[in-house]
């Protein structure tokens, strides 16, 4: 079983799909990584040679920010917005949608479960 960026890749999947199990790598990034490493994207992950795994691992370490580093960067960017006190930071701080979505109805994912108000009717 190949272990790349601290993640055990699933055994019997195409390597292009298996790489998407790593946080920060989607289909298009996986295709670019495999093209740069010179590995066929239809190869199953359990059929990879050690040299192919090493080339993929080296390519990811050099060119792509994944897992812990990416999570840390995202949380630091959000923290920076909150410290600045800009509109987006305030929305993050209040737990409301950040990108201009409506909040009179919907937005339940971001706002959490509905809290009913006593005595409020149409």
From Swiss-Prot:
Pfam families: Ribosomal_S13. SUPFAM superfamilies: S13-like H2TH domain. One of its GO terms (biological process) is translation. Keywords: Ribonucleoprotein, Ribosomal protein, RNA-binding, rRNA-binding, tRNA-binding. InterPro entries: Rbsml_uS13_C, Ribosomal_uS13, Ribosomal_uS13-like_H2TH, Ribosomal_uS13_bac-type, Ribosomal_uS13_CS. GO terms for cellular component: cytosol; small ribosomal subunit. The keyword DNA repair does not apply. The keyword Ribonucleoprotein applies. Residues 95-122 are annotated as: Disordered. Disulfide bonds: none annotated. Transmembrane segments: none annotated. Part of the 30S ribosomal subunit. Forms a loose heterodimer with protein S19. Forms two bridges to the 50S subunit in the 70S ribosome. Belongs to the universal ribosomal protein uS13 family. HAMAP family: Ribosomal_uS13 (MF_01315). PANTHER family: 30S RIBOSOMAL PROTEIN S13/40S RIBOSOMAL PROTEIN S18, SMALL RIBOSOMAL SUBUNIT PROTEIN US13M. Located at the top of the head of the 30S subunit, it contacts several helices of the 16S rRNA. In the 70S ribosome it contacts the 23S rRNA (bridge B1a) and protein L5 of the 50S subunit (bridge B1b), connecting the 2 subunits; these bridges are implicated in subunit movement. Contacts the tRNAs in the A and P-sites. This is Small ribosomal subunit protein uS13. It comes from Geotalea uraniireducens (strain Rf4) (Geobacter uraniireducens).
């Amino acid at each position: 079983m190949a272990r790349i960026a601290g993640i055990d890749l699933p055994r019997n999947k195409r390597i292009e799909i298996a790489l998407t199990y790593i946080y920060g790598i989607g289909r298009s990034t996986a295709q670019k990584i495999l093209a740069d490493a010179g590995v066929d994207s239809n190869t199953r992950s359990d059929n990879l040679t050690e040299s192919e795994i090493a080339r993929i691992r080296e390519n990811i370490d050099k060119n792509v920010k994944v897992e812990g580093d990416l999570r840390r960067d995202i949380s630091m960017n959000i923290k920076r917005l909150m410290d600045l006190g800009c509109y987006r930071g305030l929305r993050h701080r209040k737990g409301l949608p950040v990108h201009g979505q409506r909040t009179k109805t919907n937005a339940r994912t971001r706002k959490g479960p509905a809290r009913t108000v006593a005595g409020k009717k149409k």
